[in-house]
Amino acid sequence: VFMKQFDKYMINILSTLGQLGIYSMGEKFAYTSFAFMTALDQVYVPHIYKEMFKDKEGGGKSIGKYLTPFFYCSLFFCFIVAVFAEEIITLLTPPAYHGAINIVMILSMAYALMFFGKQSQLLYAGKTKLLAALMILSVLMNMGLNFMLINRFGAIGAAVSALAVGLIFTPIYMVFCQKHYRIEWEQTKIFILLGFFFSSVCGLLFARPQLS
């Protein structure tokens, strides 16, 4: 919640009110993908806890396989939001907000990575102090990158900052999670889909200025 509001606060200080409005609009559309993931995790979290407590040693393998379809659904929703960002923003907002299109696309990539941050390994292991420390690290990274990027690029800088934090922090978070309760992810499928998703959205971002 702090980071969600802090981005806007930093834009307000370091950039213009117009940039704040554009970012706020883009963030609202992109946030639908995170809201979808939050609703979806109410389906699988109870099952994961059950497997963790039932089979403390071998549960990680069944959990990894069980989570793959939910990862598909989450990534697909992020993909739809990113790919159709231009159509959605163009149809539903006045021209002054059309600068939010790229922001929606970038934030959709950032929210896609949050699927891995929703897994409850550290809570199951009782490592709440470690979890708090990791969250504080994430906040500090976000603050530092926001200060550097918003000052130079405005609202786009805030979106890139959120994506950069996701790309750096997610692997760190996953290392600690796997250390305390190992989930046997179907890595090949996940990396292939993430590669397709990121290359598609990045390709669209770079191609947009040349497309009618």
Protein language model features and the residues they cover:
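Interfacial/gating helices of multi-pass transporter permease domains
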Residues: 11-31, 98-101
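Helix-loop junctions and terminal segments of transmembrane helices
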Residues: 26-71, 121-124
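Transmembrane alpha-helical segments of multi-pass transport proteins
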Residues: 138-141, 187-212
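Alpha-helical transmembrane segments of multi-pass membrane transport and lipid-handling proteins
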Residues: 37, 60-113, 143-151, 201
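Membrane-interface junctions at transmembrane-helix termini in multi-pass inner-membrane proteins
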Residues: 108-137, 177
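Transmembrane helix-bundle signature of multi-pass secondary active exporters and lipid flippases
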Residues: 23-42, 73-77, 107-114, 165, ...
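Short alpha-helical transmembrane segments in multi-pass integral membrane proteins
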Residues: 27, 69-81, 135, 156-177
